[in-house]
Amino acid sequence: MIGRLGGLTLCASMNASGGPRHLVSCYHEVVPRDQQSGAVAEAFASLVGPHVDDERIPLDRAALTIARTEYPDLDFDPYLGRLEELARCAKARLPRVAEPGETIAALNYVLFEQEGFRGNREDYYDPRNSFLNDVLQRKLGIPITLALVYMEVARRIGFPLFGVGMPGHFLLKHYDVEGRETLIDAFNRGAIVTARECQNRLDEIYSGQLPLQPQFLLSVSRRQMLTRILNNLKNVYRAARNLRKALVVVDLICAIYPRSPEDVKQRALLRYSVGQLRGAVEDLEEYLKMSPDASDADEVRHTALSIRRSLATRN
């Protein structure tokens, strides 16, 4: 039997006569959680966990911690220094008292004209587009990571920006002293965009089937922004069937939302898929504690019991 929970297929191997073995018998060993990835998750949790106020989350350091899932020995200092350097260049182009339009123009000149940052349209799903160190080095990114660079450079010159998580695209928003909003598209060289242009973008992505809603242009929290980066990366890894890397990413999502039943369940199923049975059953049982009346509770309970029985035979 092949079981599916939360969109993930659970493997069941066949015995010699062609019948199904026990659900978990296709795993011949219990694979422990990687210590290095566990350390990255702990470091990430210290930056973004529920104990941290959202506005105090350091987006630059949190994004570089995500990059440590791929580059475990990554030194943050050169990349933080690079952001400082970009900010100094932008500030040098500003008058003592700058209007928002002047600041946006200075940021756009430094990032896109002088430095040559651009959207990676040729290889949009390259995982490196989601790692801040790679984006700063290669000067290539996707909308959300280019927005993060733009946002962090702007912050360093005292120009506050907020993320806007429009479906299928990511923008930035600035509020002037009178509360008027300006939308900025970092993926398209810092262009200032209108609501009509946002609708045109949705029409391109969704073939005219998704009308622009006011909530699409609301500011998102820092946690939401980091979660979107992680979801992008998770989807890239799952599409490539690299479940081990997808698991490391979901571990970080759970660091942001440790009480999210769906994220805990998804981590359980990824742990199961890579043979981390003890971690899988612990997550499934935690999911049941958080969502005892979930529609799939019986199926999850049966799977957890099957794993417990399999583990007991190995002791």
PLM-predicted stretches and their roles:
Residues 1-11:
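Extreme N-terminal basic, low-complexity initiation segments
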Residues 5-6, 18, 35:
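Generic extreme N-terminus detector
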Residues 9, 13-16, 22, 26-27:
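Short, positively charged and aromatic/hydrophobic N-terminal segments
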Residues 24-315:
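A structural boundary/capping signal
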